[in-house]
Every structure is written in C-alpha cells, then in structure tokens.
Design a protein with these regions (language model features):
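In a subset of proteins, long, contiguous C-terminal domains/tails are tracked
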Residues: 11-14, 399-400
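Positively charged n-region of N-terminal signal peptides that target proteins for export
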Residues: 1-7, 11-12
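Extracytosolic ligand-binding ectodomains
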Residues: 2-4, 23-400
C-alpha cells in the first residue's frame, strides 16, 4: 500500500546516519520498566483477565534531555489504560503499559524495536517514538515484523510512508508551519519575519518549510529578514537575537521546544519588548510557563489540543491527569493518550489483537478524543483543526 523494500531500506539508512549526529545521547543499555495501569485487586474486582493482559508498549525518552516528553507519553498512556480497566478492560482483558527508554537515541531505539518485535505475540502495538529521526530508524523494523507503531509526535513528511503499520497522531510539520506563519502574518499583522531554529533534524526541516512558505508570500509584502541557527539547550542566545533585531524582525518564529522559546523570550524582550514570538505545539507545556515567567506572555502557538477547552471530556481528562501527575498535560502527551485510545478501540472493534486486522481497522476508525476528531488517511496521517493559543497573565488562552 505505502512502501517498497528499497524505499524502506534507504529511509532506515538515512535516519540512522542523521541521528548519529543529532540524537540526544545514546546511553549504555536498554531500559524496559513494566508498569501495570490498574492494580491486581482492581482487575480481580472487575472480572478482567489479568493473566492474559493486552500490553501496549510506550517507547520514548524516559531519561535524558527530552525525558519530560517520554514521561508525558507514559503518564498519558497509563491514564488511558486505567480508563479502560475501570470499564472492564479491552476484550475483557486487563490493559498494561510497558515502558521502554530509548533516550531519544537511534541506537537505543533500534535495540528496543528489535526487542519488541521479538515479543510481538505479547505486545499489541507501540506508542512512540518521540523525535522524527528516531521514529524513522525504528519504523522499518516494526513494519517488517507487522507491529503497529503510532507516534504522537513525529512530524517529518516521510515518516508515515515507511509502511502500512506506521501511523502518526500528529500533524505533518508543513501544516503546523503554515499555521504558525498564518498567526504571524494574518493574526498579528507582521510582515518582517525572523526565524530562530535549533540545529537538529527537526529544527532544520521546520525552518526550511517556514522559509518556503514565506517565499511564497513575497507578493503580499511578507519577507524573511533573517534566520539564525542555535545550539539546543544553550543559555545565551543574545548574538542570534541581536542579528534578528538588527535585521528589523517584527515577529520571530521559534523552531524549537520550550527550552528554546523561554530563554529567547526573556532575552529578546530585554532588547525589544514589542517583538512577537510564535512557537509550535511542542513548546506548549506548563514547563514553558515555569521557565519563561512574564517574558512568555504574548507567545502564540497553533495546537490541536487546548487544555482549557470547555468540552467536558477534555475537562475530565485534564482534571484526571493533573490529579495523577501534578501538572496539566501537554499537547504531545494528549496525542499519546488518544493514540492508546485508538489502538484499544481498534482491537475492541475487531475482537482480536491480530496486528493485520487491527491495522486495517485503524484506517477505518473515526475517533473522537481529547485532541479532536481523528481519522487516518491512506498513508497513516491525520488532518486536524488547529486552535490558536497565546499566553496571557501566565495562562494559556485562545487568541481573540
């Protein structure tokens, strides 16, 4: 349907080479920690079969620089499993979440993927991995062995085309990039746009997409005035900010996560308090508010999950997540939550954990979750409506 052997092999090679340079560190071994989402007594009291559970793997960085994303995936997955277990499980069987720490490393992800496929009779599917490059390293292994992978965060356009068993519950970066530019130009009325991006696969790809979009808007008087690439995790972006400011940027699109957006906002507003800053959904988190303080007021994002929605199901989810883990869920964690829900719903619908049947059902599924209405297209991608969000008085609110 979506692949040929040569294409898969080339993508695997490219991803492994690229991630050797840009991954966040590989670590010495593979960590797999099992976490049962419901207690034994809960399983017994509900009449669920806990001796033959349905296991869902969550493979993501549980340690290292990006651990908050992997931990968020796992927390959300356990919350969804708990919801199913409180209602009798899936096919009458207890749902269990099994965590694998890939450290956002291609090498670790390869080892983990090989371990998971060796146990595929016990694993119903994989939620993960986090970064696009790591996902694209592991995906051919899952595809070849007919193991379903749903990434809540991969945004590289080529990821889902690796195979029929490969899905993403995240928008392709070209669509989110277009939404970010739309905020800068049409909502905020800015014409002179700057870009600051992290020197990673995602940062390079995203900034390139933004450049292409801006190039196509020249006839509307929109121009890219400067683009600065920076190291992820740096404490000092003053040199890049000075160049963007000297170039006359009215708005800056930050191609990075909260640990880029927060310090850029702090340092830029010392130079130019009126600068407009636009970020992406991977920066939409409580960590941004904590790290950025007053400086992130006015930062804008396009997101497909808004924690302060008036929809009751979202309120219930946010309350349950906050009660369990002490903070509101991020957009990406919420996409992991829905990813588990879609996988379990497909299993329930076909009455079996056979991966071919479940895969076919996922392509047919219409799922209403906390991140909106989801339906996979023929390549395993989703198309969702964005909510435009900004920060006001230290809180996320919908843009006027």
């Amino acid at each position: 349907m979506k692949r040929n052997a040569m294409a898969v092999s080339m993508l695997l090679l490219a991803a492994m080479l690229f991630n050797a340079a840009c991954s966040a560190g590989s670590g010495a071994g593979t960590t797999a920690a099992k976490n049962e989402s419901g207690s034994q007594s809960a399983a017994e009291n509900s009449g669920m079969d806990s001796a033959h559970p349905i296991k869902v793997a969550v493979a993501a960085p549980m340690t290292g620089d990006n651990s908050e994303y992997g931990i968020g995936f796992a927390n959300a997955a356990k919350l969804m499993a708990k919801k199913w277990n409180e209602n009798g499980g899936c096919l009458g069987r207890e749902v269990q979440i099994v965590e694998y720490d890939d450290k956002n490393s291609s090498e670790e992800a390869t080892t983990i993927a090989q371990k998971i496929v060796s146990e595929k009779d016990e694993i119903a599917g994989v939620i993960g991995h986090f970064s696009s490059g790591v996902c694209m390293t592991a995906a051919p292994i899952y595809e070849e062995n007919h193991v379903i992978e749903i990434s809540p965060s991969a945004s590289h356009p080529d990821y889902s085309s690796i195979g029929d068993y490969i899905f993403r519950n995240n928008t392709v970066i070209s669509k989110e990039g277009g939404a970010s530019v739309d905020i800068a130009v049409n909502d905020l009325g800015k014409k002179k746009i700057g870009i600051i991006s992290i020197m990673t696969d995602w940062g390079t790809n995203t900034s390139g997409i933004i450049k292409g979009i801006l190039e196509g808007m020249k006839d509307k008087g929109v121009e890219l005035v400067a683009h600065e690439e920076v190291m992820e995790g740096s404490d000092d972006y003053s040199a890049a900010i000075a160049k963007l400011n000297d170039a006359g940027a009215e708005a800056v699109i930050c191609c990075g996560m909260y640990n880029l957006v927060a310090p850029v906002a702090k340092q830029y507003k010392r130079v130019n308090p009126d600068i407009a800053i636009i970020a992406f959904s991977n920066a939409y988190s409580t960590q941004l508010l904590e790290l950025g303080g007053d400086a992130v007021n006015g930062v804008c994002f396009p997101v497909i999950f808004f924690a302060d929605s008036e929809e009751q199901s979202i309120k219930d989810y946010v309350d349950a997540y906050t009660k369990a883990y002490g903070a509101a869920p991020s957009a990406l964690s919420s996409q992991a939550y829905d990813s588990v829900g879609m996988l379990l719903t497909a299993i329930q619908n076909v009455g079996d954990t056979d991966s071919e049947k479940v895969k076919d059902e996922l392509y047919k599924l219409d799922y209403h979750g906390v991140t909106g209405d989801t339906r996979f297209d023929k390549t395993g991608d989703v198309d969702k409506a964005f909510v435009k969000v900004t920060i006001k008085d230290g809180k996320f609110v919908k843009m006027d």
